[in-house]
Amino acid sequence: MVKLANPLYTEWILEAIKKVKKQKQRPSEERICNAVSSSHGLDRRTVLEQLELSVKDGTILKVSNKGLNSYKDPDNPGRIALPKPRNHGKLDTKQSVDWNKLLKRAFEGLAETGGSTLKSIERFLKSQKDVSAACGGSAAPGFHQQLRLAIKRAVGHGRLLKDGPLYRLNTKAASAEGKEGCESLSCLPPVSLLPHEKDKPVAEPIPICSFCLGTKEQNREKQPEELVSCADCGNSGHPSCLKFSPELTVRVKALRWQCIECKTCSSCRDQGKNADNMLFCDSCDRGFHMECCDPPLTRMPKGMWICQICRPRKKGRKLLQKKAAQIKRRYANPIGRPKNRLKKQNTVSKGPFSKVRTGPGRGRKRKITVSSQSASSSEEGYLERIDGLDFCRDSNAPLKFNKKTKGLIDGLTKFFTPSPDGRKARGEVVDYSEQYRIRKKGNRKSSTSDWPTDNQDGWESKQENEERLFGSQEIMTERDMELFRDIQEQALQKVGVTGPPDPQVRCPSVIEFGKYEIHTWYSSPYPQEYSRLPKLYLCEFCLKYMKSRTILQQHMKKCGWFHPPANEIYRKNNISVFEVDGNVSTIYCQNLCLLAKLFLDHKTLYYDVEPFLFYVLTQNDVKGCHLVGYFSKEKHCQQKYNVSCIMILPQYQRKGYGRFLIDFSYLLSKREGQAGSPEKPLSDLGRLSYMAYWKSVILECLYHQNDKQISIKKLSKLTGVCPQDITSTLHHLRMLDFRSDQFVIIRREKLIQDHMAKLQLNLRPVDVDPECLRWTPVIVSNSVVSEDEDEEADEGEKEEPQGQERELETRVKVGKSVSREKKDQESSSLIETDKKPEVKELASSSRLSKQALPRDSLPANSQPPRRGRCGRKNRKTQERFGDKDSKMLVDETLSASQEQYGDCEEKSETSQERFTEMEEQLAAPQVQADGKPDIPKGRFSESVELWRGQLKKSPETLKCRLPEGNDRLPCCYTDGDRAFFRGFSESSEEEEEPESPRSNSPPILTKPTLKRKKPILHRRRRVRKRKHHNSSVVTETISETTEVLDEPFEDSDSERPMPRLEPTFEMEEEEEEEEEESELFPRGYFHCLSSQDILRCQSSSKRPSKEEEEEEEESDDADDTPVLKPVSLLRKCDVNSASLEPDTSTPMKKKKGWPKGKSRKPIHWKKRPGRKPGFKLNQEIIAASAQECIVEPVVPIKPGRKPRTQENEEIVEVKEDLLEERKEEMHTEPDEEAEEEEDTTSSDIRAMSPLDSSNSPEAEPKEPEPEEEDEKPSDDQRQSEEEPQELEEQEQEEEDEVTTEANQNEDHDADDEDEGHLDSLKTKEPEEQPAREDDKEEPGIQGSFLAANMQDSRENTKDKDEAEPDSEEDQPSHEASVVSETMPGSEEDHEEDSNTKEELIELKEEEEIPHSELDLETVQAVQSLTQEESSEHEGAYQDCEETLAACQTLQSYTHTDEDPQMSMVEDCHASEHNSPISSIPSHPSQSVRSVNSPSMPALESGYTQISPEQGSLSAPSMQNMETSPMMDVPSVSDHSQQVVDSGFSDLGSIESTTENYENPSSYDSTMGSSICGNNSSQSSCSYGGLSSSSSLTQNSCVVTQQMANMGNSCSMLQQNTVQPAANCNIKSPQTCVVERPPSNQQPPPPPPPPPPPQQPQPPPQQQAAPQPPPPQPQQQQQQQQQPPPPQQQPQPPPPQQQPPLSQCSMNNSFTAAPMIMEIPESGSTGNISIYERIPGDFGAGSYSQPSATFSLAKLQQLTNTIMDPHAMPYSHSPAVTSYATSVSLSNTGLAQLAPSHPLAGTPQAQATMTPPPNLASTTMNLTSPLLQCNMSATNIGIPHTQRLQGQMPVKGHISIRSKSAPLPSATAHQQQLYGRSPPAVAMQAGPRALAVQRGMNMGVNLMPTPAYNVNSMNMNTLNAMNSYRMTQPMMNSSYHSNPAYMNQTAQYPMQMQMGMMGSQAYTQQPMQPNPHGNMMYTGPSHHSYMNAAGVPKQSLNGPYMRR
């Protein structure tokens, strides 16, 4: 028949039902909907529809119970498989079978005198034809089951008698039935008053029946009836109303009767005690608590119950023994218990039991069975009694045994056997309810928990009582008592109960565990039949629980376990720790939780253990590994909690194990490279334990750290404790003080010395030895090695590593003096080594794919590790060693890593730890066997491989970028040597800086994934790796590092290592302490986590900052020179970092990714404390002007970008030269170069954005480079070559940084600590944002006007300033408080504030280019937060936010595309941030520049100019362009928002945790965005990072991004506005221009000239033209700036913009954005300001709202609007349509929608955006891939041209390619990737491909690996970069799609994503993970890698993904 429901959906629903049932939950509609939507992205309405249809089809079974509907699989209904024969044994599959008759026939047929066995009965019945026909072959198993049930029921009803295994008919049943009742009471001895009853007064009786209100004259039946009156209250009732039998009435009248209200227990005589547990005797109606009964009862007895006082004494031991035997039997086979004892007695006692009085509403607990059942009941009861099975206490009892015995047995049976209730047939059970409502009430309760409530006295006092009572009555003899006690003991022993049940009703009250018998502290939810037992027996190895010792003994014979079912990850002496995965060993973990609950009062987790890892501590002996305790932690914890639950068994308490576990949890956190914190809130005990631990750890850390200055970040890094906990502990220790506007850590030497003295006196019995840990963060994806190293360093190698690292550093040339930095460096190096080798190793496709997939699957696990400590260490090692031995690393992946380890070891013993850690992590697959033999290689290697996969991906990506890349190997090595030295120095710096950040704050839990990613990115170590580390970690790391770096940088180059730490300690400490409470923690957190991220981001930003600061100080002497040097350093850092990943990519990206607004000055300059903020902007503006003079003099914002043609050429040259030179430099002086490169990259990119245009930036960047003079030549060369490259690299680094920062911010949100940071960030950022915006507005205005004049001066100043602030947190600080920047202290303070925010932003802007991703993300996160607040202030933008949220979603993907652009935008933002004025004016141009400016002039133009010629195709292309190049700024904005929201998804979602969590949609957007938006976010962050970054991170990022997206995807309006700019810009890259307009759906960016006219547009023009990313920024700026003219500038500026607005609700948001723009910052400045502000303004309000508002409806609306126009041309529409949800999301700016994105989102510029930075950083090829990405992302991300954008992406990519000359080859590849011709609308096919891929994973498209492939090196770099960038969005998408993360992501992000994008996120997720996993590794170099980009992103952004 035709099915009504879609069979696929039905299958999904059945899967969901199975999944829900597996979770031990009821398959309700809600749960089914959630499960289906999380797995398949199907919306709720559809699921419910299909569910109903499936029910109608009969394919799903609907079960209603108590008004609740459940759904079951009819083929696998679970318990309802067979309609349970509830009616008197009559149950059978065929209703025709009457089991009673069948059984009778069987017994009669068999005629066995002794009885028949079950088997013989079954055989006999099966031989009967009618039976075999009815229950034929298929029903055989069912037949056996039904037969057993029927027999059991018959025994229960008394129709059969059971003697052992034999059953026989009960012939007396019928006759007995009748007699039973009478016998029961009449045969009982007469009642007499008990001693305590005799002298009690009797109340005056009330002569009215309380029930019927009749008198003794007439009852209900109008018959006269004597009343029974209560002796206490006088209330009376007719016996008939009380349902008393005549016998009972007689007996009651002779006694002192109490009514139900007055009833007291006759044993304990406590009236108030649990009345529910009271039983009423059916003989005397006295009450007894179940615990007070002679044998205490746990369950209400079923039949007639006679108290111990009335029970007849039966003489004869035989009977008792028989009963005891029966009891034993019953226990062995509890099933045999008669179900209704009650009923059996029922009839019998029907009269008597009528006693069940339905009195005043409270039924007598006495059970009356329904008459219908009474016959069988009584019969049953009788039989049971006879049988002893039921130990009836009724009629038969007198015959067979004395009442006491009977009671005892009865009690025992009740006590020990499963309650009859449960087993009773339903029909039979029916009565109970009535029979003893009360009894049952108590019963049920008591059965589980109450039974022993008063037991103790119950047993003892009762026994005495009873003895006394019985004795007094002389009913019982001594012999009886002996018998009783004897039997009781026997019975209790059987059950293992040795004492009376305990009064607290703990169930169970005792457990036997191993050789211990442990009294429990609390009840645990064991199944009822177990929990009601007084004692449970647990297997101490598998933790199974059993009812008796016998069963336990039998189990022990069979149980082969002798240790927990997991990998042993730690062993020292006789102590081991096992890592048990709740998803793998579910039963074990559930049993462990049940056991733990016995000793924990607040534990709530028992059955849902899948998301947790359990670290089980064991003490080992010959027998096995005995459980001592455990702690659990979430695999993917948003808050970075490292302990969820912790428990030590009582017998091991007070022996140091608790501290051991806490210490161990922090060791793991450190290995993950993130600070950890126990899950809040803590229990009182937990608080005590943790406070003691924190105190001791901090005091010991302070004791060992004698630095003058120590910051909380450093403490956090050293200890792994999150900054918030450190702060609270320091506060507790009274070691925090507020002095001169800063918090200072006071060393209380006496306290420290006292503690150490105590410690020496009482050594710890058990201590964690990090050397013994063999573990790679499998699940939590953290920077494993780094933190581990830190910890190990903390643990003792600290000093050695420091010394050795110092050695290294000295060797390195930077010669950092801070061992911590060295340690960090080593960490970084190790990570780098680890990662680099891993990258190399992973280069093998098999490994790659393996790792890629595992990484995908284990994003949290593997990826973070990469990012985690391991990753970081490796990275550092790699940076050091990698820089040194880049070649070696590349060539000898693992061996290199190991060698590097060796190097590290040489450098420091920590290196040994690192080596082990690195080995474990880097070589985890290898070392697995060695280092972690206990951990199954599979898992270890999986994580490591995943980690490596990410590394590999990034390395492959990085390979292009880094010498390690294919092409660059030689260069790399040359550079590697240089990088090695420089790397060491930078590594030192990097590590130093990160170290201090790491030190200060423990590894950031926030985005360990990022870190890991970063390490993976280590090939372009400084650029991308760091970016990525920065991306996730940088937010915090950069914040913290920036803080740390700020001071150190301020100190001097030579002091760089230490000063950084020192300032960090001192100033940062103070700052940190301030920030600590809010921002600082996260920062510190970031610090720690970011070691590498920081290294990357901060190394680029901070390190450069350090170098900058040193250089800045030197730079103060030589402003520009030091600054540029820092840029060089940045670049070197970048190269170091980027060496692995960003190096190549960064150069490419640099060109393309130089945001216009961003000065290309090194971050050092930016960071220069002496610089004035205004100067920064002016410089940038001037530079921009100079640069843009060519294209748009008015738009000085473009300073960063050279004339497109120039830039293209330069980019090409510089890219390649820079790539090589960079690599050389990177390798030669990886540290310095990487730093310089990163600095240069970011600064250069920033400075270059102005400088690029005028070449002044290059000169300037080169100027600073002299400081790194050996690099300077390179830098100069690089500057010319690298300028584009640097622009890209810087952009990329900026992106990374922004991403890092955003991610860190995200991390912050994720972490509570981070959240604090974020809050502070948000607060501060908003403060600073406004300041910045104001600055920007003014400067922006000035900037545009002053651009030409001031740009140079400003650029110098700005470069310095920018370098200073930007490099550290000064960037943000710079803008917000230039003064702060100028003043080291103030700067740091400001940085602290700004650090988070502005560091994010400024880092994004300036150093972001190198680590633009992280930075931008961070910046965006911060900015988003800041601007979110702004947005909140500006309600106008809330709608925009929603739109943006949608756009963000779009742009998540766009983000991937736009990532590079994002860099540019970041650069722009950085510029903005760097110099408020400069930033603003420069922003549009910068933003444009972002995409095209340095690295991608042509591309920029191309990007920007995509729209005019593209037509519909053009639109997508242009959108793509915009998305990519043009969108660089918008894209960046997009990305920024998305990064924040999406790229930040990790960060954003977490950073935006407040927002994201507030808005599922936001998270969605974050998730989706993250999917593609992570990059976008990062990119966006760089663009949006300005102001968008902060709030964009969450909202603003979204807004900006969305604006960009809107402008790009949804609202061409931005692009329209931008279009003029685009056209202008397009002028350089013609293709781009053509492609771009349609993309933008804005008029082509001809308005470049209008820049001044349209403030928003001029910048947009510049942005659009120079950098397609500006479209969004343009849009935003246009909207923001134009909004001043037309508030809805996006809408008004071009109709197209408005249509996009209409298309996407986002545009409305953008309207708000224009409002933000209204905060007009004149000219470009206004644009940027608005841009920044928009993020803030939008950020706050809109982020949450956009997410929420945008959700599916809006997104779909947007998508549809946009999708239709553009998708159609390519059949994107279909593709989009197919991914309707995705598309919808895409449309709305659902960059998050990976599926959508690949198709529609692609046009958005996510990938595109990414490409610019990537391209800029890497090569044009890189850019091309990025553009490809953009294409993909653009298609996906940009709603209005989304579909077209698929086409456009090609163009965009091509544009990007155009922008960077080398890109063309990549372009070809890209286009090939997309199946398009490189230049023109090759993208057309691309969109389709994208469309196809979209379903797959836009990541592929997003990460145009083909471009990477094309230019192996460049592409790789780009891939790495792109991957990296893409990875962030993709990572989030990966995060969602990540197999491992898929679940988690799906948990809330995905669902949110779903909410936001329909099922896009889901589609994307599944698709992305696979494509990611496969593609990513499959084509590290190609778009497969791009798809893998998601994975690479995962790998690179693994941490994000993890997030």
From Swiss-Prot:
Cross-link (Glycyl lysine isopeptide (Lys-Gly) (interchain with G-Cter in SUMO2)): K836, K1336
Basic residues bias (residue ranges): 866-875, 1009-1030, 1148-1174
PROSITE patterns: H15 (PS51504), MYST_HAT (PS51726), SAMD1_WH (PS52014), ZF_PHD_1 (PS01359), ZF_PHD_2 (PS50016)
EC numbers for this chain: 2.3.1.48
Compositionally biased tracts (Low complexity): 1031-1042, 1473-1490
List of residues that carry Phosphoserine: S419, S472, S786, S941, S954, S1090, S1091, S1115
Keyword Zinc-finger: yes
Annotated stretches, region: Mediates interaction with BRPF1, required for histone H3 acetyltransferase activity: 506-809
Modified residue annotations for Phosphotyrosine: Y901
Single GO MF annotation: chromatin binding
Region described as Interaction with RUNX1-2: spans on this chain: 1511-1636
Region (Interaction with RUNX1-1): 312-663
Subunit composition and interactions: Component of the MOZ/MORF complex composed at least of ING5, KAT6A, KAT6B, MEAF6 and one of BRPF1, BRD1/BRPF2 and BRPF3. Interacts with RUNX2. Interacts with RUNX1; phosphorylation of RUNX1 enhances the interaction. Interacts with p53/TP53. Interacts with PML and this interaction positively regulates its acetylation activity towards p53/TP53.
UniProt subcellular location: Nucleus; Nucleus, Nucleolus; Nucleus, Nucleoplasm; Nucleus, PML body
Protein's UniProt name: Histone acetyltransferase KAT6A
UniProt record similarity statement: Belongs to the MYST (SAS/MOZ) family.
One cellular component term from this protein's GO annotations in UniProt: nucleus
Acidic residues: compositionally biased ranges: 786-798, 1043-1053, 1065-1079, 1107-1120, 1230-1241, 1282-1299
